Amino acid sequence: MFPWMTALENACFGLRMLGAEPGEREFKAKELFSRFGIAGWESAYPHQLSVGMKQRVATIRGFISRPDLLLMDEPFAALDAQTRMDLQQELLEMWGNSGVGVLFVTHDVDEAVLLCDRILMLGGKPGTIVAEAPIPLPRPRPAEMAMDAEFLNLKRHVLAEMRRLRD
């Protein structure tokens, strides 16, 4: 986030670069601030926001311009468990309703199985795709799904594949 911009200005940055009118971009951003549970923080600067709030603003900034593909590189790694679960569910909802493709990078197998339709495992130098695991779980995917037998079987399969690749 740009430290000299408010949370709203940061969220609207991509739309601003695309030439969207100020009223249009602020309307879209404020709607997403409400949806992501951070309404009322639009005027705050990054140093005034928690790590979770900053991640929500970054997620809004990514989705607001509706790109064809959004790269998310370990966006939840530094978050506490509750905030991570909340943001995972918010991401799943946004993702499902937006039509935006997401390339999600994570080292967390549970997170990958919950969020992704397909897991690609990388190895070697430079990193190349060495294995793939489709995730045929139905959507929507509530956090409680992580306790279902099918989820746990998929997780076991991914972990076994990772062990196989390591050996």
Regions found by a protein language model. Give the residues of each.
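Catalytic Walker B motif of ABC-type/P-loop ATPase nucleotide-binding domains
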Residues: 70-73
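Helical segment within the ABC ATPase nucleotide-binding domain
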Residues: 84-98
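Conserved ABC ATPase "signature" region
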Residues: 12, 16, 23-41, 93
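Signature (C-motif/LSGGQ) region and adjacent switch/coupling loops
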Residues: 8, 42-45
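Conserved H-loop
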Residues: 99-105
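Short coil-to-helix segment of the ABC ATPase nucleotide-binding domain corresponding to the Q-loop/switch region
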Residues: 5-13
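Conserved signature/switch motifs of ABC ATPase nucleotide-binding domains
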Residues: 44-47, 65
